């Protein structure tokens, strides 16, 4: 039977991508249905109990800047907050939080259940309804049919998922959950490129069996950072330390002696695992010259006895896992409460997607998260938000939107996936972005909140706070520019106390702040420049904008040059065999990738500047060169 009410958008899957997709669509006013196999696991952290990190924290801030959920949830659930790279420049500083799994899941579910325009329904999805290359609905396990104008697939590791522990394996979406086999088979019938990837998770340890007294502690920062631009440290629950132990030669010997029982080394696992989160057996073999690896013992929550040993992801048999755990300091009597495992699953080539994350071959079908070959909660959530907002726009007959590489890490992520594809689980790093100085955590709202408002994602409260911050920044910069000090000033000694070289000419507040030895707090502590801003976010922006003004201006010039290519659009149905002068290799790559713009084409491996010039000349001659607004 058909469900009585039609929907604008259906989201399939309730993980990090699915929850952001559903929230985005509903916030934009579209009637949205979230289908999940289990309402109790909405927003579940399937692997590590943490949000953020290098590159990843930037994505969380961008999600928040556009009205998304992840940052607000972790502010309510985070049990340890730290700024990574705090001694480095603002471009690579990143926020990371350990999270209480239960509190995080509760925060996500509460937000979903109180979101207008959003319906949640518990049923696994077995099929899609596709008519004339257009998706028009979904069919659940019990045969119930739902109609919609757009469907977002956020199915994580569930598509034909297979769990491996040693040489044994069984079907599963993750530990304790069934796989999605009928839906995987249905998707393989569509004209899409599919492959397999692998990821893994470590065994969980009973904290009561660990001797923490012999292990160094790692505490969070004080004062505590916050993730959301609307958040404050008062929202954080009680804070907890992490602990550090290390593998040793005994650990490595256990691993080397049992490699024949590893499904990866025995050739049973075919999927490629994440390069930057390797299993402990992979680390021991790939870095054979190292006799120790650092392991972080991370608490899973305030009311849980489980410890997540970050750094020993493994698919070795349980008896070997037991030996590995007990070989490390403080863990001699440790007990495992959940075994580690690897999981293989289907993913679909993201080069078959438009930058909006809509599929090129099935109209109205959007993919987000691990189905696109990414790894990580943050990467999934960012894609989910983008897919959800574009599904909502499509259902309202509006054009899609996607950020450029110079606008957001989300733009880098999507462009990398859609242009280059991936053969291994893709994770975000700051090093993937050309314009890191422009794409900082601290200015995510300045980059994206206005666009979020235009798209209908940003509510009145966030918009008012954003405009207040903008006003504070501009007023303070003008105030500093208006205050001058000269070498004959009575206050010269106070100013010189901050400077490495005494002031020899008249200078205003901004010129003094531009000096590397002067920071905003020191400057505004002087009577002449007091009082400083009480809005810490605005004060940080004033300092960064002033100190990095020259560098930012140079990077903006580079961006404007690149935009000329980004805005030169390529016809979606162009057969590059028609373009005289291109090599067979270039023709094959362009026809395979089907880039949407000259800029995207230029980033495909093997596409030379000469080939781009030939293509531009041909497009002009044919009258096909169009530029986006």
Swiss-Prot record:
SUPFAM superfamilies: FAD/NAD(P)-binding domain. NAD(+) binds at residues 273-287. Its cofactor is FAD. GO terms for cellular component: cytosol. SMART domains: GIDA_assoc_3. GO terms for biological process: tRNA methylation; tRNA wobble uridine modification. It is found in: Cytoplasm. Gene3D superfamilies: FAD/NAD(P)-binding domain, GidA associated domain, C-terminal subdomain, tRNA uridine 5-carboxymethylaminomethyl modification enzyme MnmG/GidA. Its main location: cytoplasm. Disulfide bonds: none annotated. Transmembrane segments: none annotated. FAD binds at residues 13-18, 125, 180, 370. PROSITE patterns: GIDA_1, GIDA_2. GO terms for molecular function: flavin adenine dinucleotide binding. Keywords: Cytoplasm, FAD, Flavoprotein, NAD, tRNA processing. InterPro entries: FAD/NAD-bd_sf, GIDA_C_N, MnmG, MnmG-rel, MnmG-rel_CS, MnmG_C, MnmG_C_subdom, MnmG_C_subdom_sf. Homodimer. Heterotetramer of two MnmE and two MnmG subunits. NAD-binding protein involved in the addition of a carboxymethylaminomethyl (cmnm) group at the wobble position (U34) of certain tRNAs, forming tRNA-cmnm(5)s(2)U34. Belongs to the MnmG family. This is tRNA uridine 5-carboxymethylaminomethyl modification enzyme MnmG.
